[in-house]
């Protein structure tokens, strides 16, 4: 008998419902989705709305409203719950509020007997991923945050627009905090087989333009929040990408919130931060210790130290 894959979503807000919709319309891998939210009517409404579209799907998926007991046999628990970033707020402003929320959620999930993989998308995601690891006492490879996957997607979109190529031909990452202290790996970036440094040498693009592109990446969330109140479609797709990579054992390299403990020159320890890692059915197979330039390593340390300064204030 084929194994039936089950995902539980905690959080039926904009991000959670966008992920649920993305998972539903591309549901070849997941057989059951349970949605949990403290706002029970909202979660029930999302379940009803999704179920009413079953006739239009290639394959039906069982979608239900539930509670933490439903996590006991889940393969993956996705957490998108928590307070959202408001106009003028940084993601780090949410640390204290969302840590309290996460303690209750993670305790509830683990008490069910859940032994699968956590995927965290709530902000500040790097810190909330660390918080989940601490409160769950799970091994680090079974706790994953969305990290800089969305930032990287934004970067590749902007570069693809600039060079008039498909995003699949852009090989570049945003690393560090999912937030203002992130950095682009310009020194390692390639457009197809050609390095970005070659394009700069040819005069095709200038470094000042690259600075502007990175600023667009960093400010993208603020722009979307200003225009429509919140970001959720793109990150919903990003969560689905991570979930699919786990369910189908893809060994896919993604810049998730990875647990760093001595990689990248042994300067960064005991922290979750955006860095490329291999995602598989066990969660994280390996955090890739890429050789990055000295100037990028310095940015990585600055970003890590900023996150660490917030983590050190949390009492576990």
UniProtKB/Swiss-Prot annotation:
Beta-D-fructose 1,6-bisphosphate binds at residues 156, 171. GO terms for molecular function: L-lactate dehydrogenase activity. Pathway: Fermentation; pyruvate fermentation to lactate; (S)-lactate from pyruvate: step 1/1. Gene3D superfamilies: Lactate dehydrogenase/glycoside hydrolase, family 4, C-terminal, NAD(P)-binding Rossmann-like Domain. GO terms for cellular component: cytoplasm. The keyword Oxidoreductase applies. Allosterically activated by fructose 1,6-bisphosphate (FBP). It is an enzyme of class 1 (oxidoreductase). It comes from the Bacteria. The keyword NAD applies. It catalyses: (S)-lactate + NAD(+) = pyruvate + NADH + H(+). The active site is at 178 (proton acceptor). Its EC number is 1.1.1.27. Substrate binds at residues 85, 91, 123-126, 151-154, 231. The modification Phosphotyrosine is found at residue 222. Signal peptide: none annotated. NAD(+) binds at residues 15, 37, 42, 68, 82-83, 121-123, 146. Belongs to the LDH/MDH superfamily. LDH family. Homotetramer. This is L-lactate dehydrogenase. It comes from Borrelia hermsii (strain HS1 / DAH). The gene is ldh.
């Amino acid at each position: 008998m084929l194994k039936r894959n089950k995902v539980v979503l905690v959080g039926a807000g904009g991000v959670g419902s966008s992920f649920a919709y993305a998972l539903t319309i591309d549901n070849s891998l997941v057989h059951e989705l349970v949605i949990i939210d403290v706002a029970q009517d909202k979660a029930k409404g999302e379940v009803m709305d999704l179920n009413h579209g079953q006739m239009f799907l290639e394959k039906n998926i069982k979608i239900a409203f539930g509670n933490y007991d439903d996590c006991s046999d889940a393969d993956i628990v996705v957490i998108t719950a928590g307070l959202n970033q408001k106009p003028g707020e940084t993601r780090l402003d949410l640390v204290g509020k969302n840590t309290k929320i996460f303690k209750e959620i993670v305790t509830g999930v683990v008490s069910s007997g859940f032994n699968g993989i956590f995927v965290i998308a709530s902000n500040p995601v790097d810190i909330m991923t660390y918080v989940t690891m601490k409160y769950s006492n799970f091994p680090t490879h079974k706790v994953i945050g969305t990290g800089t996957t969305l930032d990287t997607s934004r970067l590749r979109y902007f570069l693809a627009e600039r060079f008039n190529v498909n995003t699949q031909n852009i090989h570049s990452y945003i690393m560090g905090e999912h937030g203002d202290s992130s950095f682009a790996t310009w020194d390692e970036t390639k457009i197809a087989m050609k390095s970005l440094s070659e394009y700069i040498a040819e005069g095709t693009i200038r470094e000042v333009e690259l600075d502007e592109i990175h600023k667009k990446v960093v400010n993208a969330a603020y722009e979307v929040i200003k225009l429509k109140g919140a970001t959720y479609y793109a990150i919903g797709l990003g969560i689905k990408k991570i979930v699919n990579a786990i369910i189908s054992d893809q060994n896919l390299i993604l810049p998730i919130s990875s647990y760093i403990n001595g990689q990248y020159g042994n300067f960064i320890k005991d922290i979750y931060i955006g860095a490329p890692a291999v995602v598989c059915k066990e969660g994280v197979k390996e955090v890739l210790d890429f050789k990055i330039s000295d100037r990028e390593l310095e940015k990585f340390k600055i970003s890590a130290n900023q996150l660490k300064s917030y983590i050190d204030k949390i009492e576990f």
